[in-house]
Amino acid sequence: MPMMWLFLTTACLIPGTLSAGGFLDFENKVNPEVWMNASEIIMYNGYPSEEYDVTTADGYILAINRIPHGRAQTGQTGPRPVVYMQHALFADNAYWLENFANGSLGFILADAGYDVWMGNSRGNTWSRRHKTLSANEEKFWAFSFNEMAKYDLPGIIDFIVNKTGQEKLYFIGHSLGTTIGFVAFSTMPELAQRIKMNFALGPVISFKYPTSVFTNLFLLPKSIIKLVFGTKGVLLEDKNARMSFITFCNQKLLQPLCSEFMSLWAGFNKKNMNMSRLDVYMAHAPTGSSIQNMLHIKQLYRSDEFRAYDWGSEAENMNHYNQSYPPLYDLTAMKVPTAIWAGGHDVLVTPQDVARILPQITNLRYFKQFPDWNHFDFVWGLDAPQRLYSKIISLMKEYF
């Protein structure tokens, strides 16, 4: 924790240092993607980009992006296999595009002949809209990953199916993105039938043994968390604060401090990270979520059970679930062919937690643990294209 406070304090002082004498050369060191959204990153790298809004059954308006084909495939005809990708907590869909094109899963899949779609979870920067509710209202933020699974994912998949004419697609999730998939596919068999294969990277199902400093937050009572963070959104985008962090971390002498901060959060291996892209990673997170989502994750913390959100009273639970206690998610009910990857140094999804869920996946077709990987390596690791992405494509060709 002292390292985190030092990071935050120093980062806040950096803008004054810059304005005082231009001691640090900020502008010349920033990657252009820092200022771009997902669509702009796609086009900047020479790929075709499409952007759509999807309205869920409960009224949330979600922004999704599409890369219909790779850079060198404009002459190819016929439908391409569809892939949908779901990001982690506090991220957005630029998450899949933040390394160079030859190291980003979104671009690699497009170049491999796939029709790539990437969603944004409700409440993040790009999906903070609703047909009737304002983001200033507490009711807008009354959701967790339960609603993302119940409404967001079915709505997006229906949209993709209607747009492409293809009835089935591949699903790739990382971290909380896997949670959304597991909940949806285990509770909605009709949706599960549309999934050719479920690729789960660093799956968050069991959350009993995390060692990240970040998870100490979940030791606090729910009332204290609400007192500190409020009852609406949490870690919403703050461009000024984010630029302070980016300025700080762009300095070569100070990058080790940023590495330490990220290591405390979710593990970090700078030898497997392109440190010149650190500003791009930080520019697109955090993007925000609901405090209710955080409380649902807290509910999993050090628990033996994987349940729907507890609304806090028998009456409220009865109103939402028609029973006095939130229902268990039954992973054994999920019949989708599934592949899982885990990291041996992952401090959020530890090997012990992964071991607890594997017996519950009744159609597990592939499992691999990389002993040296942490939670970020799945999306940012320099060796991810060779060790992970190539295997994903191989399995897609097998389960077509």
Curated annotation (Swiss-Prot):
The secretion signal range is 1-19
Q: Identify the domain of life.
A: Eukaryota
A Pfam family annotated for this UniProt entry: Abhydrolase_1
Listed Gene3D superfamilies:
alpha/beta hydrolase (3.40.50.1820)
E.C. number(s) listed in UniProt: 3.1.1.13, 3.1.1.3
Where does the record say carbohydrate is attached?
Answer: N274
Keywords for this protein? Disulfide bond, Glycoprotein, Hydrolase, Lipid degradation, Lipid metabolism, Secreted, Signal
Annotated Gene Ontology cellular components are: extracellular region
InterPro entries linked to this entry:
AB_hydrolase_1 (IPR000073), AB_hydrolase_fold (IPR029058), Lipase_euk (IPR025483)
> Which cysteines does the record link by disulfide bonds?
C249-C258
Q: Where would you find this protein in the cell?
A: Secreted
Q: Which SUPFAM superfamilies match?
A: alpha/beta-Hydrolases
Q: In the record, what terms sit under GO molecular function?
A: sterol ester esterase activity; triacylglycerol lipase activity
Q: Which GO terms describe its biological process?
A: lipid catabolic process
Q: What tissues harbor this protein?
A: Highly expressed in the epidermis. Also detected in other tissues, although at much lower levels, including liver and kidney.
Q: Which residue numbers delimit the AB hydrolase-1 domain?
A: 81-381
Q: What family does this chain come from, according to its entry?
A: Belongs to the AB hydrolase superfamily. Lipase family.
This chain belongs to which protein, by name? Lipase member N
Organism the protein comes from: Mus musculus
